[in-house]
């Protein structure tokens, strides 16, 4: 299927905003608010996505096809725990007993649903692609360096008094 719509920054912003809003409203009963994006462009320099020095849980899912890329969804640990408890109907005590793997699974699934919504926007615009399996990164004060040929877009959302950051790396297929 030939590509019919140019992938612009405004289109990417529209797709990720719709995906984050739909997933968080449906799965968490929370409505995130879009904040102005931190425009990084194609810089190879590792840059912070503004998540401060708090422990982070970062879900990532890739997409491959007519356009390739990764979406990293950054949540601070406190919000990741809150999301997990809500998704699974658990108390904080039950979550403590269940351990970090449950948080990883829940954030992996939230990320998968979010990137699935983003991917659907790409497919509907003439860029068919498929998702990769989700993976999780955990840490404090780390940054992600894009490859030189990738274009980077970082979008911030405020949700339940927490910051959610969608860090998108994209490049056309070769």
Where on the chain are the PLM-derived regions?
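N-terminal auxiliary interaction/assembly segments of multi-subunit proteins
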Residues: 1-174
